[in-house]
């Protein structure tokens, strides 16, 4: 059995610095050589031991997401897998930040594996694990009107005001192209790994959701910016599990024979007690 702790949508850019581990616990960690608890984010004490930690996007803006992922890896004693959400790219040039995220993760010496249409493979006591990761974005097709959904998203989603390309703002058309590339890559890579390594476990990690069922409060005209209806096309060659974020809707479910989970914290400033009491999810495969 392989144990994966997972969380998403921590939105640390919206959270002030705080002493995450108060009093004598923080003092002892500093003086006993124990890795310090991250100063921002959810409490990570008293969690079950995990083989891998998954951070499914909207962790922090820019390279700070990698910094936090490394702190989590050190504190929990497990490698961290990170995919970018849309918020990682806010106030950034996406074409420049993407390679910078890969480079920053590589400098952690294996503590953080950043994924974008790439695979992180682990040989663990419970077996071999392949984690396939990408932001995923969306096909804007959820409500049956791709053009209308793209126009609505361009007016109402901060992604298309706050994310930049080298010379222009990021547009829904750019998100759609990235989605199509990631979607094709997932199919090809799952098929290849099933053939080459049939005994291994395969877990997909995306930021955007793979089905309407996981929209939570984000239904209606904005829904196509949050999810695409993908699971039926993976029915014949499914991953063992799919972890996502983006919709701020916590769930554990099975659809089309695929276990789908999400553990978003959300905005501490907006979502109050639920965010403050947040605990990562635990997935066993």
Q: Where are the regions that the model predicts?
A:
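Glycine/small-residue-rich loop that forms an oxyanion/phosphate-binding "nest" at active or ligand-binding sites
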Residues: 94-115
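Charged helix-capping and loop-helix junction motifs
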Residues: 67-71, 96-100, 220-230
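Active-site-proximal loop/helix segment associated with metal-binding centers of metalloenzymes
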Residues: 132-202, 208-213, 217
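Active-site environment of divalent metal-dependent phosphoester hydrolases
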Residues: 11-17, 60-66, 87-97, 119-123, ...
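Binuclear metal-dependent phosphoesterase catalytic core
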Residues: 123-125, 216-240, 248-285
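Active-site neighborhood of phospho(di)ester-bond hydrolases with catalytic His/Asp-centered motifs
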Residues: 6-8, 53-58, 81-86, 113-118, ...
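N-terminal active-site segment of His-dependent metallophosphoesterases
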Residues: 1-83, 88-96, 165
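Beta-strand-turn-beta hairpins that frame and shape the catalytic cleft
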Residues: 1-5, 119-133, 254-259
């Amino acid at each position: 059995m392989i144990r994966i702790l997972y969380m998403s949508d921590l939105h640390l850019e919206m959270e002030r610095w705080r002493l995450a581990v108060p009093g004598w616990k923080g003092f002892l960690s500093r003086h006993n050589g124990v890795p310090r608890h991250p100063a921002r984010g959810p409490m990570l004490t008293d969690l079950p031991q995990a083989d891998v930690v998954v951070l499914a996007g909207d962790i922090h803006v820019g390279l700070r997401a990698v910094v936090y992922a490394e702190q989590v890896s050190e504190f929990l004693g497990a490698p961290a897998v990170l995919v970018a959400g849309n918020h990682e790219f806010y106030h950034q040039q996406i074409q420049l930040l993407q390679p910078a995220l890969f480079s920053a993760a590589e400098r952690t010496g294996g503590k953080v594996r950043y994924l974008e249409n790439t695979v992180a493979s682990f040989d663990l006591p419970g077996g071999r694990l392949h984690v396939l990761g990408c932001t995923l974005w969306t096909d804007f097709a959820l409500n049956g009107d791709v053009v209308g959904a793209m126009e609505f998203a361009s007016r109402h989603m901060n992604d298309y005001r706050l994310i930049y390309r080298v010379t222009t703002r990021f547009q829904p058309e750019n998100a759609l192209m990235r989605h199509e590339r990631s979607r094709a890559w997932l199919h090809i890579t799952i098929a290849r790994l099933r053939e080459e390594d049939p005994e291994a476990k395969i877990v997909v990690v995306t930021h955007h959701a793979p089905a309407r069922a996981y929209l939570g409060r984000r239904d209606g005209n904005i829904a196509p910016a949050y999810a695409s209806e993908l699971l039926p096309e993976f029915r014949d060659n499914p991953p063992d599990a799919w972890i996502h974020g983006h919709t701020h809707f916590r769930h554990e479910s099975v659809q089309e024979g695929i276990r789908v989970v999400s553990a978003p914290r959300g905005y501490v400033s907006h979502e109050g007690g639920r965010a403050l009491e947040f605990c990562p999810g635990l997935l066993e495969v």
